[in-house]
Every structure is written in structure tokens, then in C-alpha cells.
Amino acid sequence: MRLIQPYDLPLEQLQQYLPPLNRPDDFTEFWQQSRTAMAAEPLEASTELVPYPAKGVAVSRVEYRGFQGARIRGWYARPTAGAPHPGLVVYHGYNWNLEGGIHDIVNWALHGYATFGLSVRGQQDSGESVPSPHGHVAGWMTQGILDPAQYYYRGVYLDALRAVDWLARQSEVVTDRIGVVGGSQGGGLSLAVSALAEGVTVAVADYPFLCHFQRAVNLAPAGPYGEINEFLRRNGDPAIESQVFRTLSYFDVMNLAPWIHCPVLVSAGLIDQVTPPSTVFAAYNHIASADKSIRAYRYFGHEPIPRFHGEKLDFLMRHLEP
């Protein structure tokens, strides 16, 4: 049975919802050191052209060295005529299989964008190189969660930054016109990368994940956030709970949002039980960009929103001009 809106806060309250940031004291230093460590690793990229039944588009398999040596893979589709092109990096949802979605990458290329679709480490065919020093529940949300330096999403975020770097190195890409897009986990990554990377021109995030963890864990225990609930059920020590949320605070898109200055478009479904709308608005309302917009859809949950796709295309065209 579908929920009746409002499932979360009413829209009028969501628009004003601005919980305080909970950044650790060394938040800025942590990310400066993390980016420096990533930059010190060689890219070691390779590209292999593969056949694909689409006219006017060339498709390649890409591999590069991610954080701590993980082999990160993805798909690259570019228009075969009219170079140079604006670029897009596409980030996928949690445990989603990009293999079945290559057509989405190709579709962006048919719209005129040189498009790289990243396969997130461990979730598909990209490797995972950071071992967890402790047990974790099924899934990725609690792998290494007791130490920010060992946490799974540290590698994910840094791999995602390197995806922008890889795309900017392609000769057919206009380096000052690169956008990032994605839904759910991919939406969270789009916002995180916009905060942490240099050279992102525009970002679009569909119902972003990884936002306002403290509230998300309370409101969405059945989705991926539920992995954190399950970990805390099995580890009842209050000191462990405190450390879990301290680790998550380094990766909370809400805490990264004040570093976002590029144009941003965000969507939220008001009956979304996976990425509750208040968690999305918490991050959005902290974004520093003067050019930002959010679309709230009253009758949609955690699902593709057809009307937003047109909004997304228009927003990207205005800022990237393919």
C-alpha cells in the first residue's frame, strides 16, 4: 500500500529545515589529506573500444587506479562527430548493476555529452582494496565504520573524484564544462564530488542518499540505512554507537554541502522511505551555491520521476550547452 503524503515533514517545513552541521574538528583536514593521498596515486588508466549497436556513438570500457590501488571500471560513451563535447560523469545507485544500464550512458552521449559511467567499488565489477578491520553486516554501509580512514565510503568518494579527473583528461572533452549526475547513492556522490572536486561545472542529484545520517537512520530502517541499524543492534555499546556516527559525519553530504558552489538541481519524492525528504532537504538547504533549485514531488517515493528527467535535461543544457 502506498503512503499518503506527508510521510515525513510537510513541504513548508522541509523548505525551512536546516539542522546544524555536525562536522568533526578535523573535517577539513581529513578531506585535504584524503585528496592529497588520492592525487599521489598514479592514474594507470586504460581504455578499450567495444562494439555497441548505436549510430554516432563510440563506447569504451575504462579502467583506472582508484583509492589504495583498487581497479575501478566503468563505461565511456562519446559522440563520434562534432568534438569537443561537454562531459558528464554518471554515478549509479546502491548495489545497482550498470551492466544493464549501458544504454543510459549511451543515451547521454546521443544528447551530445561525452559520458563516463562509474562502477562503484565492490558493487559491480570494480575492485575493493580497503579491508574492514572489524565485522560488518551484509552490504557496504558498515564496512570499516569504526574508523573514518578505513570506512568504505572514503574509497568510494575518492574514486568518484578521480572519475572527473579521468574524464577531464580526454582530448574530446571541454574541461570547463563537466557535469555530474546520479540518483540515490549516485545523487549523493554527485553532491559529494561537487563539494570535493575541482572542475565540476554543474550537478544534478535525484533523491540523493548519504544525507543527514542521524535522521536517516531513524526514519528509514528498511533500506540501506537499515544496515547501520542492524550493526548497532548487534553492537550495543554506546561508545560504538558514538563512533559510528562520528565516522558517518565525515561522509555526510549535509556536512559537505557548504563547499558546493556550482549550479545544482535536486529532486525529492515526498513519500520516499529510502532517502526521506527531510534528509534531502537538510543537505540541499546547506548548499552554498547561489544557483540551486529543488523539485519536490508529492506523490513519488524512491523511484524514477519522469517529469524530473525533462527538468534535468534542460538544466544541463543551460549550463553545459552541448
Feature annotation, model-predicted:
Residues 99, 105-158:
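Cap/lid segment of the alpha/beta-hydrolase catalytic domain
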Residues 270-275, 302-303:
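Acidic catalytic loop of the alpha/beta-hydrolase fold
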Residues 74, 78, 84-94:
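Short beta-strand element of the alpha/beta-hydrolase
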Residues 1-57, 322:
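N-terminal targeting or regulatory segments adjacent to alpha/beta-hydrolase or S9 domains
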Residues 260, 266-268, 272:
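Short beta-strand/loop motif that positions the catalytic acidic residue
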